[in-house]
């Protein structure tokens, strides 16, 4: 039987100004869908897998073809409905409505488990969309680099007086998300030892300059770390091995990294985490033949892995969960103190979320890197006092290789996002940019996610699991005129542990686009300030007052 999810073909987004669709409002989602499956972007594009275990862009190749065909004929007064990667309907709406509405892997809470999802998945009734895979705004590993960089910089401020020179970070996983860690560490001034079981991933990170060296043994990797830290150099090494073996071995040897984290795809025990003692080939085969055996072995390995992280924490090493739900699995497997160390959001990122600051991103539909460099310059011009951001943009230009369509990630917040969006739109109108840009973000943002073991862990008022907020965020983005809006379940941390929404808006240089951009790029981050103000965070309350937000049940205005 032919696998409907496997097809040996290369997909790449069109570039330039010639349209395949009826307008830029439908050309934009078409190109970004294709960009998600570019061989330089996606992890397993022939299987429709973009990143994060089995995060897909479309349910089957037949569905992909139908989405493409529909987008090419969709008018500016129609909206395409996509249900878990399948184009199920086209409806008459209006010009300011989203052109595409997407819902991925959403399940009624009682049934929101991997077992139930996998059953639906096998029947062809569902698709795991991760966060930006099924919402068509993945830009490669750059998409998470700045967030990781901000985390490491803040950890350096809190624990090492703001100086990571001569320090090293231990982590695991070099997939679509984890691959950001070594480069982010180096940008923050630290060395990094990243453990990865799949050599092809290490090689890919070497090729795209996200990692500096490769090692086959722990001793070889440690020798490089020792050499670099003593010389005060910031460099990274990808060690081919299993984190469930390497982390405990380092504990056994009494070796103390300066920061410990992990970004293996532990959120998906079957497809995302190699059990200790298994080869990659054996693992891939048993995912099909005996998935339950894989799950049992992977979960047992995660317990060992997290136990080692707790050991590092108890040694006084700053240790953080980077949002893959590995602590939850370890606790379910009997490790009572699995949550001894914190997640990265409550430890380092929440003050940014309180001001609506998060992973704003844009991609140049022209395909020309110069369009991105021009927008980089515009960001500096409009935000002249944000030297930290200027430093990031300079490092990004120097170190980050574009994957697929040229793109940029840039953490900015309420009051700045709409300003940048309007400026980019004017650059398209004037011809300074060769073609329109799309502006979006990760679902990991201040007002668009409920994830009690990650973004909303340890909320001040105990509202960690309240998922009204991402639903309201999606609804408001629809009402505001985003070009496409998505609502997903299970991204980052797996089934049953998160709900989250995304939006993308196209800046095509028109007056209509300007009006939509101003609404969307103000309202979207404002929901994050609202959510954190409602939880009682003073930073968010002050920001809401400063920006003049009308929050009757919170500010009484």
From Swiss-Prot:
Reaction(s) this enzyme catalyzes, per UniProt: 4-imidazolone-5-propanoate = trans-urocanate + H2O
A GO term for molecular function: urocanate hydratase activity
InterPro entries cross-referenced by the UniProt entry: Urocanase, Urocanase-like, Urocanase_C, Urocanase_central_sf, Urocanase_CS, Urocanase_N, Urocanase_Rossmann-like, Urocanase_sf
Keyword entries, A-Z: Cytoplasm, Histidine metabolism, Lyase, NAD
EC number: 4.2.1.49
UniProt-listed GO biological process terms: L-histidine catabolic process to glutamate and formamide; L-histidine catabolic process to glutamate and formate
Protein location: Cytoplasm
Gene3D superfamilies: Urocanase like domains (3.40.50.10730), Urocanase superfamily (3.40.1770.10)
PROSITE patterns: UROCANASE (PS01233)
Protein's pathway: Amino-acid degradation; L-histidine degradation into L-glutamate; N-formimidoyl-L-glutamate from L-histidine: step 2/3
Catalytic residues, chain numbering: 410
Top-level class of the enzyme under EC nomenclature: lyase
Claim: Lyase is one of the keywords in the record: yes
Functional summary from the UniProt entry: Catalyzes the conversion of urocanate to 4-imidazolone-5-propionate.
PANTHER family: UROCANATE HYDRATASE (PTHR12216:SF4)
Family indicated by similarity: Belongs to the urocanase family.
Name the UniProt record assigns to this protein: Urocanate hydratase
Organism listed in the record: Allorhizobium ampelinum (strain ATCC BAA-846 / DSM 112012 / S4)
Name of the coding gene: hutU
